[in-house]
């Protein structure tokens, strides 16, 4: 039960930080603060659904692969905008079942350069910067990360993928999730 309270506290600590004014921020950070404030106050609402993680078969034994949960069910909420250049920027908070079927909370910011293919179809490439917490890494102490992010979208739906790098026996996971703009 303690892990659930930690996850809730983790997300609640992020919300007030994004809603505060940027006037007191140092000049070098003010632009980022203003963008986060814009996303939070003007952005559309997003529903995130997670569902699949693929562990690179070349990096794990077949016994280890069988022990992993690759159905990373979960979900979350977010806010996002298409900025003045047509690029996507968003804030999100999700929780899903990790490779060991433990709940993994994650909250962060994503950016993608968007290429349009027709009026309703788009492709994106960018990155996400986040905080997460895992039972098998630092005993659930939240830690930061940055990962590549690719997407394909049609109208209000977008499918995302990222690859978590690693070495032999850790990491090397393709993680896929979806976003519905509403």
Swiss-Prot record:
The record marks 64 as: Role in lipopolysaccharide recognition. Residues 1-21 form the signal peptide. A lipid is attached at residue 22 (S-diacylglycerol cysteine). It holds the Pfam family PagP. InterPro entries: LipidA_acyl_PagP, OMP/PagP_b-brl. One of its GO terms (cellular component) is cell outer membrane. A lipid is attached at residue 22 (N-palmitoyl cysteine). Transfers a fatty acid residue from the sn-1 position of a phospholipid to the N-linked hydroxyfatty acid chain on the proximal unit of lipid A or its precursors. Required for resistance to cationic antimicrobial peptides (CAMPs). Modifications of lipid A with an acyl chain to evade host immune defenses by resisting antibody-mediated complement lysis during respiratory infection. This is Lipid A acyltransferase PagP.
